[in-house]
Amino acid sequence: ETIFSSSIHLPHSFLHWINDGLMSIFFFLAGLEIKRELLEGELKEPKKALLPIFAAIGGMLVPAVLYALFNKGGEFANGWGIPMATDIAFSLGITSLLGKRVPLSLKVFLIALAIIDDLGAILIIAVFYGGQINWLMLGASVALILLIAILARKKVSLSLRLILGICLWYLIFNSGIHATVAGVALAFTVPLRELGDLEHRLHIPVNFLILPIFALANTAVSFNTGIMETLTHPINFGIMAGLVIGKPLGIVAFCYMLTQMKWGKLPAGTSWTQISGIGMLAGIGFTMSIFITTLAFTSTDTQDLAKVSILLASLLSLILGCSTLYFTNSRSSF
């Protein structure tokens, strides 16, 4: 930890600056997308929002349970949050490549599901993967968030609010809650009139600079164990089961439960087979799962093993999801 004075504490390693600093910008963009969906997107109307909300909950709970079954009470139990995440950029990118084989209503469903999944991941990081809470710093963070929100309502310049956002990042970093939560908190203070322009400005640097840098910095792994030892490790079983099986199972099961209760219905022109295909694509954890790995485990060897498992599970989920969506249509049944 670099100490510039007796009271200013900041991360010092390049990897820390990527994971705590640059990724805060990614979470800022995620927060903007969540807020826009809540204000004017699919999540605005409660009846329409129920299906992706239930799907996201199922897609988080079932993978966590499956991981826990393989790592119950052991030294790797803290990794339960790893298979809960979905890489929104990858999953949406794949549906775009599939073109007309994925109906627009299904793409909208995936967007809403992935955004709720992002929100769930953010809450998990904030609550379960932070450090010891510094209540003074946390209180100062809340006060600064309120100040920024008031300034936004008064139409104070965005530049000044973003500068205050950097101060907010510092306070949250030292509060014991993960620093990236600052990005989401700041995003929720941005008024609707500024959301579209900010999202447009951030999409290219986030998707083509920040995420690739994060991926390159965090996917470099050293194989200190054999292939068979890696494949038969409880972490690999937990992550593979969670992402490849748990994601589609949880999403389909919770959607089915909702439709049986008559609380919602499938997106127009879609089938259960397509919903299962979307569930498989949601198993592409990649960047978000790797990010949670860096918080869940302190051992480099354990992190490397988990990263290999994430890459394998994400690749398998991609292949299964693409195949299912490519060879099916809305007339398909279970």
Question: What residues fall within each predicted segment?
Answer:
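Structural signature of hydrophobic alpha-helical transmembrane segments
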Residues: 15-27, 75-89, 130-143, 177-184, ...
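Functional cores that coordinate and move charged inorganic groups
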Residues: 95, 99-191
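Predominantly late transmembrane helices and immediately cytosolic-facing juxtamembrane segments
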Residues: 124, 152, 157-167, 171-173, ...
